[in-house]
Amino acid sequence: MSSSMLNFTASRIVSLPLLSSPPSRVHLPLCFFSPISLTQRFSAKLTFSSQATTMGEVVDAGMDAVQRRLMFEDECILVDENDKVVGHESKYNCHLMEKIESENLLHRAFSVFLFNSKYELLLQQRSATKVTFPLVWTNTCCSHPLYRESELIDENCLGVRNAAQRKLLDELGIPAEDLPVDQFIPLSRILYKAPSDGKWGEHELDYLLFIIRDVNLDPNPDEVAEVKYMNRDDLKELLRKADAEEEGVKLSPWFRLVVDNFLFKWWDHVEKGSLKDAADMKTIHKL
């Protein structure tokens, strides 16, 4: 191995501290449910560094360190257009438009819509360091179930619910005990594709999860720039600003699709306590 490669590998090990990462963020093929020795962890880091070099990640040196780590640690669930699991791939590859277009990579995702007891919807503005759609306003939490046993459970959408509980803690600091998985109500699924810029984008089969809870928030600045509860009129004003391009307001494409096609009629069910009557998990809406 050349000295330059050794220096690059060492720099990756220093900048991406896998040994200190929480267990939930260590995803190693075939063995991530077994104890991992220090030797195995070190070997995994070398492999990780090699993969990053192969994929040309050097050109992304300006990417935020936290987001870069998640891009390679997180393994998304690949599905076909009928939501059948067909494999897994790094978050990095799943969001490269080149890969999306050339290999038709489609991954499973979820979007949480959390309402408080006043039936106000919690929105977040994505952080400036997000790789896709930075600083756009969107629903409460948008992310991906990972290719791990607990988040691959299809029965009653349990895998996706588990993932939603995990990410609401990670992004908004909401403890798991405040968001019981059985309180998430899956309403439907959408399939969409949306470029973010010339390099990155989304191609997702997205589960839409609603929940009504009063919660305490402690947003993670690596993920979230701002949070705000909105009633219907507040949201309509936000939509108006986005349409008029006022104050730099932008909305995520998946949130706008849900707003335009479903949200306000589902909001009626939120207020009536009849959300389960609106559920249709048999249909995948191609938007």
UniProtKB/Swiss-Prot annotation:
Residue numbers annotated as active site: 142, 207
Pathway: Isoprenoid biosynthesis; dimethylallyl diphosphate biosynthesis; dimethylallyl diphosphate from isopentenyl diphosphate: step 1/1; Porphyrin-containing compound metabolism; chlorophyll biosynthesis
Catalytic activity: isopentenyl diphosphate = dimethylallyl diphosphate
GO biological process, one term: dimethylallyl diphosphate biosynthetic process
Swiss-Prot/TrEMBL keywords: Chlorophyll biosynthesis, Isomerase, Isoprene biosynthesis, Photosynthesis
GO MF: isopentenyl-diphosphate delta-isomerase activity
GO cellular component: cytoplasm
Keyword Isomerase tagged: yes
Domain Nudix hydrolase as annotated: residue spans: 105-257
Gene3D superfamilies: Nucleoside Triphosphate Pyrophosphohydrolase
Record has Isomerase as a keyword: yes
EC number, as in UniProt: 5.3.3.2
Enzyme class name: isomerase
Disulfide pairings: none
Pfam families (UniProt xref): NUDIX
Reported function: Catalyzes the 1,3-allylic rearrangement of the homoallylic substrate isopentenyl (IPP) to its highly electrophilic allylic isomer, dimethylallyl diphosphate (DMAPP).
The family this protein is said to belong to: Belongs to the IPP isomerase type 1 family.
Protein name per Swiss-Prot or TrEMBL: Isopentenyl-diphosphate Delta-isomerase I
Source organism phylogeny: Eukaryota, Viridiplantae, Streptophyta, Embryophyta, Tracheophyta
Gene behind the chain: IPI1
